[in-house]
UniProtKB/Swiss-Prot annotation:
Its main location: cytoplasm. This is UDP-N-acetylmuramoylalanine--D-glutamate ligase. Signal peptide: none annotated. It catalyses: UDP-N-acetyl-alpha-D-muramoyl-L-alanine + D-glutamate + ATP = UDP-N-acetyl-alpha-D-muramoyl-L-alanyl-D-glutamate + ADP + phosphate + H(+). The gene is murD. It comes from Pectobacterium atrosepticum (strain SCRI 1043 / ATCC BAA-672).
Length: 438
């Protein structure tokens, strides 16, 4: 634990995470200052009166006179004033670093471009099934610092690349990078390797690393070593085994669970299950408890979730697929009896959509592209694509064409903010329209 008494602390960014940092320091007798570039940031009404705040811009005088700067994950370390502060020897951390300095229980740390919320939640459920006191949070649910307020035998943290950039004291009992695909190109101007380098921080000081045997970018820089266990579709210590039309989860050559007993849908979710099982084994969660949790877990909202089914047509809400890799995962190994009606569109964040092309082949697929980058997506295979301005317009076209055995899949490969407040609102709208039109 670190003594912060007498330190001049400035917190950049309010919101839930910023407020958790304020509470953390107040509980230790330190009154921090808060700066936020927004005039009316979320959580402002909950900020205690004694905490000085500067809104609408970054207060350079405060930052350059600080002993410690706690930066929100949304603030790039490349921001000029933070570069100046770092050059001046001022320590810059994030909330996860503060958490790691205080945590007294083992930590399972999970990152990746896609699937991390599902795996984080699933490992937490596995621990609960064993009767453990577990704190689950970080980039999902509760801010990590709030987890310190309750006793825990295990912490399970979802961590973003942004959070890992400001973390040096993480000593995970088990850590994983589930996958690495292009994302956040605005934050990582030097491309995929810069993004991957941020993710790789998770393996530093980890007792055990769980790597994706199908994705070399998830490997530690020095390659797999004695600390590593692997998962994958067909290879890895934890992999899928297909026999006589059935698919099993297999660990070290032993079949442990038939996927028919799992409520999660799709090959990408089966590999998520394998990763969760590997992490659970690493921290000695009893296997029986882990499998019990796995068979009862229904998944997270907006993540390849069945929104509606009628007359043999399934409407699948995968609105959380805000990047190309997520949509690739959804389409990989997807089985549809009839035609797949795929909804793509939104704000692609300057991403390269071409990796989707191999998944868009065949006669039984139709594309419906909408939003800011709808035209670019329709160009991937124009002969089967239809472009509309909005998702609702596209769904009304689909409703006229569906037949029993078809699937309507919203897996947009794009952020939602060009037309929606959030991916959640986009998914809710899809579900509402599915029920109306189905």
């Amino acid at each position: 634990m670190v003594d912060y008494q007498g330190k001049k602390v400035v917190i950049i960014g309010l919101g839930l995470t910023g407020l958790s940092c304020v509470d953390f320091f107040l509980a230790r007798g330190v009154v921090p200052r808060v700066v936020d570039t927004r005039i009316s940031p979320p959580g402002l009404d909950k900020l205690p009166e004694q905490v000085e705040r500067h809104l609408g811009s970054l207060n350079e005088d405060w930052l350059m006179s600080a002993d410690l700067i706690v930066a929100s994950p949304g603030v790039a370390l490349a921001t000029p004033i933070l570069c100046d502060a770092a050059d001046a020897g001022i320590e810059i951390v994030g909330d996860i670093e503060l958490f790691c300095r205080e945590a007294q229980a083992p930590i399972v740390a999970i990152t990746g471009s896609n699937g991390k919320s599902t795996v984080t939640t699933l490992v937490g459920e596995m621990a609960r099934a064993a009767g453990w006191q577990v704190g689950v949070g970080g980039n999902i649910g509760l801010p990590a610092l709030q987890l310190l307020e309750h006793p825990a035998q295990l912490y399970v943290l979802e961590l973003s690349s942004f959070q890992l950039e400001t973390t040096t004291s993480l000593h995970a009992a088990a850590a994983t990078i589930l996958n690495v695909t292009e994302d956040h190109t605005n934050r990582y101007p030097f491309g995929l390797q810069q993004y991957r380098a941020a993710k790789l921080h998770i393996y530093e000081h980890a007792d055990l690393c769980v790597v994706n045997a199908d994705d070399a970018l998830t490997m530690p820089v020095r390659g797999a070593d004695a600390r590593c266990r692997s998962f994958g579709v067909d290879v890895g210590d934890y992999h899928l085994n297909r026999q006589q039309g059935e698919t099993w989860l297999r660990v070290d050559g032993e079949r442990v669970l038939n996927t028919r007993e799992i409520k999660l849908v799709g090959q990408h979710n089966y590999t998520n299950a394998l990763a969760a099982l590997a992490l659970a084994d690493a921290v000695k969660i009893p296997r029986a408890s882990a499998l019990t949790a796995l068979t009862s877990f229904t998944g997270l909202p907006h993540r390849f979730q069945m929104a509606f089914e009628r007359n043999g047509v399934r409407w699948i809400n995968d609105s959380k697929a805000t990047n190309v890799g997520s949509t690739e995962a959804a389409l990989s190994g997807l089985a549809v009896d009839g035609t797949l009606h795929l909804l793509l569109g939104g704000d692609g964040k300057s991403a390269d959509f071409s990796p989707l092309v191999p998944y868009l082949q065949g006669e039984r697929i139709r594309l419906y592209c909408f939003g800011r980058d709808g035209q670019q997506l329709a160009a991937l295979r124009p002969e089967i694509a239809e472009q509309t301005e909005t998702m609702e317009q596209a769904m009304r076209v689909i409703a006229e064409r569906i037949r029993p055995g078809d699937m309507v899949l919203l897996s947009p490969a794009c952020a939602s903010l060009d037309q929606f407040r959030s991916f959640e609102q986009r998914g809710d709208e899809f579900a509402r329209l599915a029920e109306e039109l189905g």
